[in-house]
From Swiss-Prot:
HAMAP family: RNApol_bact_RpoB. Belongs to the RNA polymerase beta chain family. The keyword Cytoplasm does not apply. It catalyses: RNA(n) + a ribonucleoside 5'-triphosphate = RNA(n+1) + diphosphate. The lineage of its organism: Bacteria, Pseudomonadati, Aquificota, Aquificia, Aquificales. It comes from Aquifex aeolicus (strain VF5). The RNAP catalytic core consists of 2 alpha, 1 beta, 1 beta' and 1 omega subunit. When a sigma factor is associated with the core the holoenzyme is formed, which can initiate transcription. This is DNA-directed RNA polymerase subunit beta. Its EC number is 2.7.7.6. The keyword Transferase applies. InterPro entries: DNA-dir_RNA_pol_bsu_ext_1_sf, DNA-dir_RNA_pol_bsu_external_1, DNA-dir_RNA_pol_su2, DNA-dir_RNAP_su2_dom, DNA-dir_RNAP_su2_hyb_sf, RNA_pol_bsu_bac, RNA_pol_bsu_CS, RNA_pol_bsu_protrusion. One of its GO terms (cellular component) is DNA-directed RNA polymerase complex. GO terms for molecular function: DNA binding; DNA-directed RNA polymerase activity; ribonucleoside binding. GO terms for biological process: DNA-templated transcription. The gene is rpoB.
Amino acid sequence: MAKIALPRKFFGRRFEVLEPPYLLSIPKNSFENFVQLKVNPYKRKNVGLEHIFRTSFPFKDPDENFILEYLGYEIGDWECNRCGYKPKDDLLGGWDVDCPQCGAKLVYKEKFTPEECKLKGLTYSAPLRVMLQLKAKTKNGYREFPPKKVYFGEIPLMTETGSFIINGTERIIINQLIRSSGVFFDEKEEKQKDATITRILYRGSIIPDKGSRVEFELSGATDLISARIDRKKLSATAVLRAFGLETAYDILKYFYEDVRKFIVKDKYLYDAQTGEEFTPEDLEHHYIFAIIKFRGKLVGFASSKERDFIEERYIEEWEDLVRLLDDDRIEVLSVTAVPRDVVIKSPYGKSLIDTLANDTSPKDVDKRSPVKVPAEYTLRDYGLMEMYKRLRHIEAITMEIDSVIERARIFFNVFFRDLKRYDLSRVGRVKINAKVHRIPKVLKPADVDLLDQLPPLALAEDYGEYKAGTRVTKDLLKELFKQYKEIKVKDYTEDEARFILPIDLVNILKYLIDLRHGRVKKDDIAHLGNRRVRSVGELLENQARLGIAKMEKVFRDRSAVINPEQPDLKPQDFINPRYVTTAITDFLKTGQLSQYLDNTNPLSELTHKRRLSALGPGGLTRESAKFEIRDVHPSHYGRICPIETPEGQNIGLVTSPTVYARVNEYGFLITPYRKVENGKVTDKIEWLAAYEEENYVIAQSTPTDEEGRLKAEFILARHKNDIRLVKPEQVEYIDVSPRQVISPSSSLIPFLEHDDANRALMGSNMQRQAVPLIFTQAPLIGTGMEKKIARDSHAVVVAKRGGVVEEVDSSKIIIRVNPEEINFDDPLDIGIDIYELRKFQRTNQKTCVNQRPIVRKGEKVEKGQIIADGHSTDRGELALGKDVLVAFMPWRGYNFEDAIVISERLVKEDVYTSIHIEELEVEARETKVGEEEITRQIPGVPERALAHLDEHGIVRVGTYVKPGDILVGKVTPKGETRLTPEEKLLQAIFGEKTRDVKDASLRCPPGVEGIVIDVQVFTRKGTGKKDMLAEKVEREELEALEQELEKKKNLIITGRDKVLKGLVLGRKVEKDAKVGRKTVKKGTVIDEKVFEEFVNYILGRPENFFEDEDLIRKIREIAERTRTQIEMLNKVYEEKKETLLKRRDLPPGVITLVKVFIANKRKIKVGDKMAGRHGNKGVISVVLPVEDMPFLPDGTPVDIVLNPLGVPSRMNVGQILETHLGWAAKELGKKIGEMIEKGRDRKAITEYLKEIFAIGDKDGENAKFIEEFLNSLSEEEFWSVVRDYAERGIPMATPAFEGAEEDAIKELLKKAGLPENGKTTLYDGRTGEPFDFEVTVGYMHMLKLIHMVDDKIHARATGPYSLVTQQPLGGRAQFGGQRLGEMEVWALEAHGAAYTLQEMLTVKSDDVEGRTKVYEAIVKGKYTYTPGIPESFKVLVRELKALGLNVKCLNGEEKPCDEVEVKEEEEK
């Protein structure tokens, strides 16, 4: 049987209500939405690339001579497997597209696999082709050219594991957490002239996804409202008018109840709605605004001729209105009045009246208000004009007012009504609606008139022929209400809903006034309702948009010089198509959010792909991010992990989503809750965003009774960022799982609830630094998340389809697929799945990936089953470290301050041994003086130094190399010397002379040693000549390809014969069949022997053997299918061969590239860093012989001795609980081993395991589970599982916040025959004496981290020097020295170590002559030296001379000691 993960004893709930979602869904779904690769190209949704193309096209030049229209796009090469058809210009290839010739589905043809791209240093990508149609203007309209597919370049694709491969390196795009578009309200202190008074300025900002920010400010000092667009201040009413609220009446009717509009006739006022007659005196206690018409001039414009104007004016008293009515020069058009008592009682107060009054009060000498425009225009045009003047910085206008208004209208439409320039985005619309509009979820017949006061709405469900998403109108509602009593609606987020609407401005002002009066709170920028995730798809979309903008500019430029009458125009003549893919590729290569993938182990890879960052373009900077943004926020609950974040300057800015978090369609993090109805928990799951959950009472995951009712009398619940005790009936939702609040990394820490947060942070971060070990071991004490993380990180191999294991070896697994899972429509589906395993591959961090099969030949495999382990996994579970026996006690001072004492057993038995792979490469290039060459003929190198190289000068695989060894021999031509006539004659007679070359070989760098495990050679194509090396490489690759082809053919034939045997074995031949010279007699039974001999004849001519038509048809189908499959395989082989023979494109100037991979086995040693999962880290201080380690009463020596003082102050008690439980788990396993040795039967062992699993099991789930599991096993499987338990111990899972309780741990220790306090007497390994006090002992999962001493230790005698100062370079990478700074000099001075100090500052640093002399003296065995003058002193002298200061250094005899040397150098 397969090596299955042993069932764990669970302390929490074994079965979750909701399984955590796929952990890489955030980046993968985002990219899939961007490219929509698995969607029919003719049915793509309007998102991602499709949305960019649809909104950017058609391109039009200014004169509209040419129009370029978009019809669709295809990604990748597509082909029909059945007939070989490839889509032409008139058909887009893609998913679910039918072949026009034979009707089969088109199939995607991958040029290179991700593995090949990594190997060859290529980008994993596919061609992007866009179908465009060009139209050219003619006298009779537009001439349409046939659609063309234009090649836009290669678009990088995401691999199955969620990363990108760019030039052979694996990279990922970090998810960005940015401020959402929408409306935000805040308040800040307003600057006052009098510094003693502070007033608050209240602000509401509309932040679009694209375009200008519109802000309204309400001054706490004056109660007046002003507006800002792009920070430029202008009148608030001007902005309102520009957006469509033209008059005072249009504005005020939304704020006050009794607003009346009057029409003026014969100096009497008539109510516009009722027709009732009023006199001016009736408006005595009213605020009055009048629209008047008069003849006059407008100052400040080019023309000052008299014309009719309309103006809106604030009338302070009713008598002023009488005067206006009596004035023959003025015509009062309408009057708006609001009763003063209505304004006083209104929640919106006088702010709006005062603002309108302020803007429309007479300001100049002739008592005219500024709100006026020519009579043929409207007051909206006044608002547009004001906005245009302010935003375009126009002070004195030299144009006619008509031109200004016309321009202002165009300006507004471009600025605020063009999706290319201004877009709130779907997110912005949803956020505005949620913030300031009260949108009902359901509309009833009485609500029809409400539509005018709401932003656009859409149907939330299908209603008959009207689909969900259809825009709601009054007519539609009236029609639907004939059939339905209520209609469910949602936000409409397309068309004009993407712009600012008048009703938005009204409700924003209402909210702003409410904020001023303390009825609502200001927005919290750290709240996750105001921050959204921009994942990889959206980030790439933004880049593509920039590329399209450049392309459109090129289109306009080229259109100007092309004649529309030309006969053969193509889209390529007008655009540079590479802009889009170049923008995307550049972002992946150099973008701020594009990072080198951290794949130290599967957990680090998974976490890196899920990471959220507040940094990057459009985000925050480390310097500007305040504490509030970095801090844990209540809205993070269930969305962002409060534990996992870096410790440095990025703390709180780089975070991780929780296990259950997902991203909704608008980019907000959502988390699942179970619905609670009347105190009863239902199984209905709802996903809520942070801004949605605020209105609900949500309880944490709480125990329920059998009926699902909440047990407790009072329950701790959250409501509006507040935590309080509520009754069960008040609870509306309940958490899905206690692990809902933490990330995958944190969820791997057992007893997390007993660790201090700071240490848990270190624990979750250090697990990502654990090095994959040679022998992996899943933790004895886990949390139950190990399997989920191993699977979702793609470290393990999972069966795509069920079947039987046909063949298995260390490098591949072949599974014959179940017949019902084979796709018979695809000729390439041969019913065989081949899984190539990754063997000893290097990761970005130089760790080793190695996959191992865990299934056997002949075994049945289910779809989704784990069939191979990867690095840091054990039987499909994550295994980052090893369970070792630890003791908490001091040991002779060696574990002082977190140092760790380890046993030599861990070194000898390779417990913590890991493999590290170094990749070195060398290029042979073309130089000005000739070509470099990879060769074994290296001048000046003795033969023994070349012993390990092959005939081409490349190191042999399997060689053990040390620093300084030649890995690849390379020679570079020196500059050609001028030949003498004699040499020229000799050269002419004897041909080419031996070239003058120098050694430029690749040598093993310092600090690198190990075994060469692989050598890869790449040669350039199209050079016209092939050297022996290139031919050898080509030959080997072709042989591998042929072997693969033969293997697949054999598998097809084996499968064919298997199916055929099922049809004909045991049947009789129904007529005499002549086969060559032989005859198969009628009635002959077809057995194995006959079948083997005549199988090909039966397939070729079944009618010669049988008369059953149905059987003959089936045999022919099998033969035809096999023939088609072998033909297709041959075709694929020929394509691969052609690609291979083209050979790899190397960078310009490179002839040959050789890569050498050196594997180094690193045992654990002094200086390596180790850690537990609880933030308990330390460096190994000593490796003790096993016999010196403290030992248990039974003689077992401990593996690691930790300092007990590392626990109390760090408050990570989880490690102690893990140690106790680990000891119990191990000893219980030994007890089972003893039972096996005593020959106890299956029943007794099952009962014993049931007893163990029942401890701490409140609802009996565990005991029932283990009994059912063991009873389901065959005899062989049962004893295999039980022996594993005996050898490994009983694995347990203590999930976070549901961990094992103290009583359960004590009971398990007791069951294992161990002391309940988890302590025992230890004996000193050196003296054999018992220690005075009992010591805490047990098993803990310890990790070896990537911070290894071999990467850090460094020593230098001589090496490279800086050119100017002649001092040694710095750093290990440069093989540099150690800097001796001022403080070190002072220390040596203080010690009086004059000679030491002198040599440090001279011969050991930058005394060029002195250091040479010292070296010579040491070689001769003499140990004296005379220091010279340091180079840095000479540099100082030269710098002073450059300043015009002649410096003389005088010795005791008053002779210049420096000048001679300086002069000598100057003469040179």
